[in-house]
Amino acid sequence: SLSTKDKAVVKGFWSKISGKSDEIGTEAVGRMLTVYPQTKAYFSHWPETTPGSAPVKKHGARILGAINDAVNRIDDMAGALGSLSELHANKLCVDPANFKILAHCLMASICLFYPTDFTPEVHLSVDKFLQNLALALADRYR
């Protein structure tokens, strides 16, 4: 679970990176589709899945918007992400293991954009936050 300190670190760091959230999201989704090509199966309806393409940019922005909502409701992530959990579980049928894959890619992308600010302390808190976010997204799978 997230400590009070973790929550403060995540909120502080997120406020710093939110200005580049669309770019970070685009990079993270592009990275996921490249490094884990099996994830492309969920996006077969897109005209293209290459990094930087319009669908990747749009989805990256959408994901980072949802994460921003989760940061703002850090004490109720399951509530903040309930409709997304429902969508991914029951309509899109996304394997919840992919949430952890995306979290890993997102941390790599954040580090590319903010190498100095992404200290070990920030890394630890963001990792814990993203793991809690993945659990919240998997909530409706039960």
Curated annotation (Swiss-Prot):
Disulfide bond annotation, renumbered to this chain: none
Keywords: Acetylation, Heme, Iron, Metal-binding, Oxygen transport, Transport
Magnesium listed as a keyword: no
Assembly and oligomerization: Heterotetramer of two alpha chains and two beta chains.
GO BP term, example: hydrogen peroxide catabolic process
One Pfam family hit: Globin
Family membership: Belongs to the globin family.
Keyword Thylakoid: no
Tissue expression notes: Red blood cells.
GO-annotated molecular function: haptoglobin binding; heme binding; iron ion binding; organic acid binding; oxygen binding; oxygen carrier activity; peroxidase activity
Note: This fish has two hemoglobins: cathodic and anodic. Cathodic Hb has high oxygen affinity, low cooperativity and displays a small reverse Bohr effect. Anodic Hb has low oxygen affinity and cooperativity and displays a normal Bohr effect.
SUPFAM superfamilies: Globin-like (SSF46458)
Cellular compartments per GO CC: blood microparticle; haptoglobin-hemoglobin complex; hemoglobin complex
Residues bearing the modification N-acetylserine: 1
Function: Involved in oxygen transport from gills to the various peripheral tissues.
Top-level lineage group: Eukaryota
Binding site for O2: 59
Name of the protein: Hemoglobin anodic subunit alpha
Annotated source species: Gymnothorax unicolor
InterPro entries, per the entry: Globin, Globin-like_sf, Globin/Proto, Hemoglobin_a-typ, Hemoglobin_oxygen_transport, Hemoglobin_pi
